[in-house]
From Swiss-Prot:
Alphabetized UniProt keyword annotations: 4Fe-4S, Cell inner membrane, Cell membrane, Iron, Iron-sulfur, Membrane, Metal-binding, NAD, Quinone, Translocase, Transport, Ubiquinone
Organism the protein comes from: Trichlorobacter lovleyi (strain ATCC BAA-1151 / DSM 17278 / SZ)
Gene transcribed to yield this protein: nuoB
Cofactor: [4Fe-4S] cluster
Swiss-Prot/TrEMBL catalytic activity: a quinone + NADH + 5 H(+)(in) = a quinol + NAD(+) + 4 H(+)(out)
HAMAP family: NDH1_NuoB
InterPro entries in alphabetical order: NADH_UbQ_OxRdtase-like_20kDa, NADH_UQ_OxRdtase_20Kd_su
GO molecular function, a single term: quinone binding
Protein known as: NADH-quinone oxidoreductase subunit B
Function: NDH-1 shuttles electrons from NADH, via FMN and iron-sulfur (Fe-S) centers, to quinones in the respiratory chain. The immediate electron acceptor for the enzyme in this species is believed to be ubiquinone. Couples the redox reaction to proton translocation (for every two electrons transferred, four hydrogen ions are translocated across the cytoplasmic membrane), and thus conserves the redox energy in a proton gradient.
Sites where the protein binds [4Fe-4S] cluster: 37-38, 102, 131
Cofactor note: Binds 1 [4Fe-4S] cluster.
Enzyme Commission number: 7.1.1.-
């Protein structure tokens, strides 16, 4: 009884977490939220020269179709509730990228009306510094997000509400 011939290279053994994380990292759909000059660089990143499709990254215009939001530019206190509403409309699991000096730390605008970093309101997964960061920097940040997704554990259980996702990074 049993298998008479070895299976060879036809079988891959992995954990369910790694399989689900591989699928998630291979199909990141970021929602663009361009607030200032960083949005121009974000649009340049989406051009054919960079070919984000080869990484499974496709920009979406609806928060209900996106699993990542790229906050690109200056976040004002008047715009913050809109960003939070859009973030809440995104399905789980969801990730946040802060693109540019203004989104990361408020940039040069240390005034009463500017939020000093989007991490005051949302959990940021990847920070991309620069004023504005080049398209290559955004591409590198997206690849770092893919690495972070692969390190998460209990991702499959969170799909069914069995627990929260935990990053080991």
């Amino acid at each position: 009884m049993g298998v008479n011939q070895p299976l060879g290279g036809n079988v891959t053994v992995t954990s369910l977490d790694k399989l689900v994380n591989w699928v998630r990292k291979s199909s990141i759909w970021p929602m663009t939220f361009g607030l200032a000059c960083c949005a121009i660089e974000m649009m340049a990143t989406g051009a054919s020269h960079n070919d984000l499709d080869r990484f499974g990254i496709i920009f979406r215009a609806s928060p209900r179709q996106a699993d990542c939001i790229i906050i690109a530019g200056t976040v004002t206190k008047k715009m913050l509730p809109v960003i939070q509403t859009v973030y809440e409309q995104m399905p789980e699991p969801k990730w946040v990228i802060a693109m540019g000096a203004c989104a990361c730390s408020g940039g040069i605008f240390d005034t009463y009306s500017v939020v000093q970093g989007i991490d005051e309101a949302l959990p940021v997964d990847v920070y991309i510094p620069g004023c504005p960061p080049r398209p290559e920097a955004l591409l590198y940040g997206l690849m770092k997000l893919q690495d972070k997704i692969m390190q998460e554990s209990n991702s499959f259980g969170s799909v069914f509400g069995l627990g929260e996702r935990v990053s080991t990074v």
